[in-house]
Amino acid sequence: MSKKYYAVKEGFDFNSNEQVKDLILESWEECIKYVKGVKGAKYKSFGTRVEAINFLKEKMENLNKVTGDYPKDCIHIYVDGSYNIDSEKYAFAFVAVKDDVIIHIENGASTDNSKKQLRQIAGELEAAARAVEYAFGIGETEVAIFHDYAGIYHHAAGTWERKDASSKEYFNFMQEFLNKKNMNIIFVKTDGHSGDIYNEFADSFAKQALHIPLSRAVDTYLQHNCIKVINKQIWDKIISVVKLNNLVNILIASEE
């Protein structure tokens, strides 16, 4: 039997009653002591010690927006995907936010139905990949990706099995930005349709790309709250998914 190495990124030592981090162990019997019954434990087995070390060095985190202490000063990008049953096409969208100001919006739809078996997941993965590429392109070295599909993180980290070409391509793409381009990527899980306005905007723009009727979540929020956008170009894009009576609460930051 080939030897395995067990990398424990986060676990717990019940004997010392302390959290443990960044351990490399050489047996499952040792590993299980630190991960069994531990909520949120992060660990993985590898065939070589080098792979285990690289796993521990990965500049990638998976947090929850409600409980996670994610950085507030880096660029935040909200991603989403959608799927049209009739056309069998998917769409992607992402909304980039810096210092509570929407600075960029991007969306689009597939040109064919070759990924219909993945439904909206194809759009989710494309949105995250494009978001990281956008952040890198404007000179950011750290980005927080807010998502409601868990695979956005797990397919990037390699903790889920990659069965289709899309997830394999996504994994390779993200690993290149992590390891060769030295991007620090923080993944933050949000609950879909929970009232998070930027997440709702991402959902609306993904649906817009497929001509799917929009939910009322954005308008409901804007009836009592304001948002800020960086310029008139983004303002114009925002109003394409907002009812006219709510425009007063969309502020252009440069005109304040």
Stretches found by the model and what they are:
Residues 36-47, 60-64, 134-141, 210-215:
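Short arginine-rich
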Residues 82-83, 88, 128-201, 205:
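RNase H catalytic domain
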Residues 1-41, 55, 59-62:
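Short aromatic-glycine-(Arg/Gly/Cys) micro-motifs in beta-strand/loop hairpins
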Residues 58-74, 233-242:
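A cross-kingdom feature marking charged/low-complexity
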Residues 216-256:
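Acidic two-metal-ion nuclease catalytic site recognized across multiple nuclease folds
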Residues 68-122, 126, 134, 247-255:
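RNase H-like nuclease fold core
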Residues 57-61, 200-208:
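Short, surface-exposed amphipathic charged segments that create phosphate/polyanion-binding patches used
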